Amino acid sequence: MRFTVAIDGPAAAGKGTISRAVATHFRFAHLDTGLLYRAVGAKVTEGADPVAAAEGLDLADLARDDLRSAEAGQAASRVAALPEVRAALVAFQRSFARREGGAVLDGRDIGTVICPEAEVKLFVTASDEERARRRWLELAAKGGTQSEAEILADLRERDRRDREREAAPLRPAPDALLLDTTELTIDAAVNKAIEAIELRQAQGRE
């Protein structure tokens, strides 16, 4: 059985949390595609060529402890704007998406570029201020020293870069379900996603 769930959205909107919960609920495989770009970005900050880093990426690179840092996020956004880097990572993502048993992929262009044929497409968003608060709490728990205002500025700059890039700009797929998590608890947001997937599965059985 092949069933693909594409979950897109800006940073700290909740798509990663929702994706992991959905994958666990349905026993689907999960891929955080942002980690691919963060891993490439981290290699580039160490002096690697972006395209070579993308072509040589392996699963071990996705386990680095520094991939959730603000620096890795900014580097990811920069390398993601390079068409050659995106092309090098597309095949990996598409192969993962059509694996047997179902798959959940979260990122910024899954429903629009990587898997436009996905059975379910969600676009998860939240207000800038709420996303900054969430990311600040996440980083502070790990000993981060960035202020909430600095994180807000970083998020807005990354959003601008992601929306304006020529290669796969950040935007909802025309048939994506919009899920605004600003006022939702994690459980409520996850339940909405599960309901959308179950509805699509039921339609497929009709």
Curated annotation (Swiss-Prot):
Keywords: ATP-binding, Cytoplasm, Kinase, Nucleotide-binding, Transferase. It comes from the Bacteria. SUPFAM superfamilies: P-loop containing nucleoside triphosphate hydrolases. GO terms for molecular function: ATP binding; CMP kinase activity; dCMP kinase activity. InterPro entries: Cytidylate_kin (IPR003136), Cytidylate_kinase_dom (IPR011994), P-loop_NTPase (IPR027417). ATP binds at residues 9-17. CDD domains: CMPK. It is found in: Cytoplasm. It is an enzyme of class 2 (transferase). Residues 155-168 have a biased composition (Basic and acidic residues). Residues 155-174 are annotated as: Disordered. GO terms for biological process: pyrimidine nucleotide metabolic process. It catalyses: CMP + ATP = CDP + ADP; dCMP + ATP = dCDP + ADP. One of its GO terms (cellular component) is cytoplasm. Its EC number is 2.7.4.25. Belongs to the cytidylate kinase family. Type 1 subfamily. This is Cytidylate kinase. It comes from Cereibacter sphaeroides (strain KD131 / KCTC 12085).
